[in-house]
């Protein structure tokens, strides 16, 4: 397959564009449409040996959640026995980092354009409960028209990853761009941490250097905690004020996206770009979990990728795991519950599962995705219960493609 230069009869593989820790990126062409893509080839063996399988799966799921003009698009995911292939939007202009390294700081008008696109993408991600956590010029790409695209969601987190205190606790990111509260180890708000990183990026755009620089990391972190930086004289007063409000070491008083959008520097001249939603499936989701607020709303209509992500038969686990017992059309056991598709009416499913927590999402008018979770008890006891009692009781309502 790969020896012929064509992947799955669908993508013609071209030259290598770059290498990463777990594989390489090729230029490729979709032979069905002629579209040029960047094909990220990930070695399963390297990923598994590094213990990074969950991170790769999370990156894939997150990228399909955040369809936005200023986010690199993930077109398709494929897998073989040894590799995972990610067909990504090909962004030909290279990294923002390289542009600054070659040409130095940018003018205020160009900086404003890049920054607006960055904030639009970040705000959209936050609206869907996604926090990037590694925003930096190396992860910002430029297309041929000079538009900015956010890339590399490998360290991203979802709102559901927060602990009971509502905060994230995993310290990650790039030292020069990470917020001081992330390093403190007491938990942090992912949205506020991303905005700090946006502040560092804005400073780099306008100054051509980092705001906090020191050969000693401890000294650099000390400067960050104090907010100890100064802007070069060519940075305008309005830009200085915005940078200062973004690089506020106190996350409680740090400017929010809503406040940022109203600042004079951000609003100057051109209209503020707002997140663009391409289709209903990409609409922002309220992550606050107020179940009582949507009792009259219809179930969410899922697109094909959401179906793949939710269905136990078609989830992302097979990218790195092989379970011979799992196949489309069978409900399969997991430590916390099970998922299956069914054509049974919702009332019929509820009647069979009234002793368990049940959640459904409409995939099509006649097809439901059912998520069954155990209320408590030991996971080891759940598996025999599932195999011997629950699965047989559900076998006539679990849908499979062959049943259509």
Curated annotation (Swiss-Prot):
EC number(s) stated in the UniProt entry for this protein: 2.7.11.1
Coiled coil ranges: none
Looking at the record, which segments are called Activation loop? 152-181
A single GO molecular function, which one?
protein serine/threonine kinase activity
Where in the numbering of this chain does the Protein kinase domain appear? 11-266
Residues engaged in binding ATP: 17-25, 40
Broad class of enzyme this protein falls into? transferase
Alphabetical UniProt keywords: ATP-binding, Kinase, Manganese, Nucleotide-binding, Serine/threonine-protein kinase, Transferase
Name the catalysed reactions. L-seryl-[protein] + ATP = O-phospho-L-seryl-[protein] + ADP + H(+); L-threonyl-[protein] + ATP = O-phospho-L-threonyl-[protein] + ADP + H(+)
What biological-process GO terms show up in the record?
signal transduction
Matches recorded under SMART domains: S_TKc (SM00220)
Where, by residue number, is the active site?
134
Region annotation (PPI) ranges: 335-356
The UniProt record lists the NAF domain at 294-321
Cofactor(s) the protein requires to work: Mn(2+)
Purpose: CIPK serine-threonine protein kinases interact with CBL proteins. Binding of a CBL protein to the regulatory NAF domain of CIPK protein lead to the activation of the kinase in a calcium-dependent manner.
Q: Which PANTHER family match?
A: CALCIUM/CALMODULIN-DEPENDENT PROTEIN KINASE KINASE-RELATED, CBL-INTERACTING SERINE_THREONINE-PROTEIN KINASE 6
**What is the similarity comment for this entry?**
Belongs to the protein kinase superfamily. CAMK Ser/Thr protein kinase family. SNF1 subfamily.
Print the domain comment field.
The activation loop within the kinase domain is the target of phosphorylation/activation by upstream protein kinases. The PPI motif mediates the interaction with the ABI (abscisic acid-insensitive) phosphatases.
Put simply, this protein is called Putative CBL-interacting protein kinase 27
Species per Swiss-Prot/TrEMBL record: Oryza sativa subsp. japonica (Rice)
* Primary gene name: CIPK27
């Amino acid at each position: 397959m790969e020896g012929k230069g064509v992947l799955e009869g669908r993508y013609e593989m071209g030259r290598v564009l770059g290498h990463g820790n777990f594989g390489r990126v090729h230029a490729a062409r979709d032979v069905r449409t002629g579209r040029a893509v960047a094909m990220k080839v990930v070695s399963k063996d390297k990923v598994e040996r590094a213990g990074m399988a969950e991170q790769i799966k999370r990156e894939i799921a997150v990228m399909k959640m955040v369809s936005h003009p200023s986010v690199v698009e993930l077109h398709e995911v494929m897998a073989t026995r040894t590799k995972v292939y990610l067909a990504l939007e090909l962004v030909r202009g290279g990294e923002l980092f390289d542009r600054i390294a070659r040409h130095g700081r940018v003018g205020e008008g160009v900086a404003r354009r890049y920054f607006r696109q960055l904030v639009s993408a970040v705000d959209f991600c936050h609206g869907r409960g996604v926090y990037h956590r590694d925003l930096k010029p190396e992860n910002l790409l430029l297309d041929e028209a000079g538009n900015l695209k956010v890339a590399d969601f490998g360290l991203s987190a979802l709102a559901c990853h927060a602990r009971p205190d509502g905060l994230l606790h995993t310290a990650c990111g790039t030292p020069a761009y990470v917020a001081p509260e992330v390093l403190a180890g007491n938990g942090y708000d992912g949205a506020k941490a991303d905005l700090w990183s946006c502040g560092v990026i804005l400073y780099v755009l306008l100054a051509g250097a980092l705001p906090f620089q020191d050969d000693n990391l401890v000294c650099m972190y000390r400067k960050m905690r104090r907010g100890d930086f100064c802007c070069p004289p060519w940075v305008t007063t309005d830009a200085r004020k915005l940078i200062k409000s973004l690089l506020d070491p106190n996350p409680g008083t740090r400017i929010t996206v809503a406040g940022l959008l109203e600042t004079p520097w951000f609003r100057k001249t051109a209209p503020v770009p707002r997140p663009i939603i391409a289709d209903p499936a990409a609409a922002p989701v309220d992550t606050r979990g107020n179940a009582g607020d949507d009792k009259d709303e219809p179930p969410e209509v899922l697109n094909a990728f959401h179906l793949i992500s939710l269905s136990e038969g078609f989830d992302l686990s097979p990218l790195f795991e092989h379970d011979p017992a799992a196949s489309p059309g069978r409900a399969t056991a997991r430590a916390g519950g099970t998922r299956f598709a069914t054509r049974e009416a919702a009332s019929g499913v509820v009647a069979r599962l009234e002793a368990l927590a049940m959640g459904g999402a409409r995939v099509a008018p006649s097809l439901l995705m059912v998520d069954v979770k155990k209320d408590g008890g030991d996971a080891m006891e759940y598996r025999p219960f599932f195999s011997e009692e629950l699965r047989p009781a559900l076998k006539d309502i679990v849908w499979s493609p062959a049943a259509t």
